[in-house]
Regions:
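Non-catalytic DNA-recognition/assembly elements of restriction-modification systems
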Residues: 6-38, 149, 154-157, 161, ...
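Interdomain signal-transducing alpha-helices
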Residues: 115, 160-163
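Conserved hydrophobic/aromatic beta-strand scaffold that supports enzyme active sites
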Residues: 45, 104, 149-151
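Short helix-capping and inter-helix turn/linker motifs at the boundaries of alpha-helical repeat units
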Residues: 2-6, 138-142
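A short beta-sheet element
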Residues: 69, 74-132, 136, 143-147
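Sequence-specific dsDNA recognition surfaces
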Residues: 10-11, 25-74
Length: 179
């Protein structure tokens, strides 16, 4: 992708400049937290990993309380709040359910995979972590009440699609190099 012609300051430390024409928007203005509780008997269990949101393996350890899970709809962005620093998050391609430690974000409007890339980026993960709390890194968590005010860069929908197309192309090229 080409560099943009001009940039403007954001006033935000994790991303100090964005292209002119983009906006900085609070996560709360883009997503609503989905907190609906469901059963894993009605909604297939999903795992949130560094590879994204996937069907849970049959061999995965399950809680005894399968009734106490959060609903996930295809298109929701899900963050594993216990593995957020490892990038365990992504847009779910499936309807299903996740454990209560996950943050499920329902897009307010149609969203693109731009947010899948943005919210999994190293700089965002560090900002997400900075807004959390805990006694040690392994027991650190960021709640939606803390993350909802994080400002993120939002280009036009057309630019989002172009960015996703470019990143998909680069990822595919990289995946051919490393099997």
């Amino acid at each position: 992708m080409k560099k943009y012609g001009s940039y403007k300051p954001t006033g935000v430390s994790w991303i100090p400049y964005i292209p002119t024409g983009w906006n900085m928007v609070k996560i709360n203005d883009l997503f609503i937290e989905r907190r609906e509780k469901v059963s894993d008997k009605d909604y297939a269990p999903l795992s949130v990993t560094k590879f994204g949101v996937l069907p849970q393996l049959e061999t995965a350890v399950k809680t005894k309380d399968g009734e106490n899970r959060k609903k996930v709809c295809a298109g929701d962005f899900v963050i594993n709040s216990r593995s957020d620093r490892r990038g365990s998050s992504g847009i779910s391609p499936l309807d299903g359910s996740v454990s209560l430690i996950n943050i499920v974000l329902q897009p307010r409007k149609g969203t693109s995979y731009y947010f899948h890339y943005l919210l999994r980026s190293h700089t965002f993960i560090e900002e997400f972590y900075r807004n959390g709390r805990g006694i040690v890194a392994d027991l650190w968590t960021t709640r939606y009440s803390e993350m909802k005010n994080i400002l993120v860069p939002v280009p036009s929908y057309e630019e989002q699609l172009a960015i996703v197309e470019y990143l998909n192309w680069k990822s595919a090229a990289f995946n051919h190099i490393i099997p």
